[in-house]
C-alpha cells in the first residue's frame, strides 16, 4: 500500500496539509503500540512496525521535495537513491557560479546586503523551479518532473548553505 492510500490522501502533489496532519494523528492514536500492550508479542511487533510505517508515510508526504521524490518512485524513478549525474551543464555552471558568489559574500565587507540580495534571487529561482515541478508532476511528465526535482535538490542545498552563512555571520550581533 502506498503512503497516499495509507493516509487516505489523494495521489497527487498538491495535498491538504491540515488533512494530512489530522489523518496522521488519528492513525497514530489508533495504532499506537501502547494500545497493544496486552496483546501477543507478534501483535505488538506488528503494531510497532505499522506505527513506524505511518510515521514514515507522514514525514515523506509532508515535505514537498520528499513527496515529489516519492511520487516519482511510484513511477519507477528512484531519485532519492540514484547515483546519476546531472547532464544539464548550463544548470551545473550556474550552480558553480552561485556557490562561488556565496563564498565571495562570506568574505565581503558588505555581507549583509549582498547576502540579502543573493537570498532573494535564490528564492525566486527556487520558486520558478518549484512551480515548474508542480506542473510536470500534475501533467505526469515524469522524466521532466524528475529533472526538476534534481535541480530543486541543488537549490535547496544552496538555500541551506545561505542559512548557515547567515547564522555564522549574524548570530554574533
Swiss-Prot record:
UniProt GO MF annotations: ATPase activator activity; protein-folding chaperone binding
Superkingdom per UniProt: Bacteria
Gene3D superfamilies according to UniProt: DnaJ domain, HscB, C-terminal domain
InterPro entries in the record: DnaJ_domain (IPR001623), HscB (IPR004640), HscB_C_sf (IPR036386), HscB_oligo_C (IPR009073), J_dom_sf (IPR036869)
Example of a GO biological process term: [2Fe-2S] cluster assembly
Coiled-coil positions: none
Gene Ontology CC terms, in alphabetical order: iron-sulfur cluster transfer complex
Residue stretches making up the J domain: 2-74
Assembly and interaction partners: Interacts with HscA and stimulates its ATPase activity. Interacts with IscU.
Family note: Belongs to the HscB family.
Protein name per UniProt: Co-chaperone protein HscB
Organism in which the protein naturally occurs: Proteus mirabilis (strain HI4320)
Upper classification of the organism: Bacteria, Pseudomonadati, Pseudomonadota, Gammaproteobacteria, Enterobacterales
Amino acid at each position: 500500500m502506498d503512503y497516499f492510500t495509507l493516509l487516505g490522501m489523494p495521489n497527487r502533489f498538491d495535498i491538504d496539509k491540515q488533512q494530512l496532519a489530522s489523518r496522521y494523528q488519528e492513525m497514530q492514536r489508533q495504532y499506537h503500540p501502547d494500545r497493544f500492550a496486552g496483546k501477543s508479542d507478534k501483535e505488538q511487533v506488528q503494531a510497532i512496525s505499522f506505527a513506524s510505517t505511518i510515521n514514515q508515510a507522514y514525514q515523506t508526504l509532508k515535505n514537498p521535495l520528499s513527496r515529489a521524490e516519492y511520487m516519482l518512485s511510484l513511477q519507477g524513478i528512484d531519485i532519492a537513491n540514484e547515483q546519476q549525474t546531472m547532464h544539464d551543464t548550463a544548470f551545473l555552471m550556474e550552480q558553480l557560479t552561485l556557490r562561488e558568489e556565496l563564498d565571495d559574500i562570506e568574505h565581503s565587507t558588505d555581507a549583509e546586503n549582498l547576502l540579502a540580495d543573493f537570498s532573494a534571487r535564490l528564492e525566486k529561482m527556487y520558486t520558478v523551479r518549484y512551480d515548474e515541478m508542480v506542473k510536470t508532476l500534475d501533467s505526469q511528465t515524469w522524466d521532466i518532473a524528475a529533472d526538476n526535482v534534481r535541480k530543486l535538490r541543488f537549490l535547496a542545498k544552496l538555500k541551506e548553505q545561505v542559512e548557515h552563512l547567515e547564522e555564522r555571520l549574524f548570530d554574533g550581533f
